[in-house]
Amino acid sequence: MKLLLLLLCLGLTLVCGHAEEASSTRGNLDVAKLNGDWFSIVVASNKREKIEENGSMRVFMQHIDVLENSLGFKFRIKENGECRELYLVAYKTPEDGEYFVEYDGGNTFTILKTDYDRYVMFHLINFKNGETFQLMVLYGRTKDLSSDIKEKFAKLCEAHGITRDNIIDLTKTDRCLQARG
């Protein structure tokens, strides 16, 4: 009887753990909860020059608008030392949890993980002139996040083949925060 009870507890633990993990991924994603202000925390890519200073994918997120079958992104980029605001709309694709946006080529992205209140992690694949690269971003509701969340993001990057030397912590850079207003 004790063995049966132990197996039942183990089974429930595994089911609950799986449900918790699944609640923050594609199938069970509540996109409406992503609406609001966000800050760029960490960015990673297998094509580092895209995320370095003056790289086209070094963007500083400000706000995500949840629209009908699309997401609006208000962000800033730095050009010649000046912060410039952009707004792009990403449209839902037929794939579950996937979106498409035109920016420095075509981009498909998914939301890998979120807890809605503190962080969201995106995975993007860019297609331009027959070439592709990956980009991963960690956004936070606050200007910085705990080292635990950053480490979870780094491990997710590694799982996607992006090495730690291609991960940049943007909290240590000028993120155009003064322009947020």
Curated annotation (Swiss-Prot):
Gene3D superfamilies: 2.40.128.20. Pfam families: Lipocalin. It is found in: Secreted. Disulfide bonds join C83-C176. Keywords: Allergen, Behavior, Cytoplasm, Disulfide bond, Glycoprotein, Pheromone-binding, Secreted, Signal, Transport. Abundant in the urine of adult male rats but absent from that of females. Induction: Synthesis of this protein in the hepatic parenchymal cells is induced in vivo by androgens, glucocorticoids, growth hormone, and insulin, and inhibited by estrogens. GO terms for molecular function: insulin receptor activity; odorant binding; pheromone binding; small molecule binding. GO terms for biological process: aerobic respiration; cellular response to lipid; energy reserve metabolic process; glucose homeostasis; heat generation; locomotor rhythm; mitochondrion organization; negative regulation of DNA-templated transcription. One of its GO terms (cellular component) is nucleus. Residues 1-19 form the signal peptide. Glycans are attached at N54. It comes from the Eukaryota. Belongs to the calycin superfamily. Lipocalin family. Major urinary proteins (Mups) bind and release pheromones. They may also protect pheromones from oxidation. In this context, they play a role in the regulation of social behaviors, such as aggression, mating, pup-suckling, territory establishment and dominance. Acts as a kairomone, detected by the prey vomeronasal organ and inducing fear reactions in mice. This is Major urinary protein.
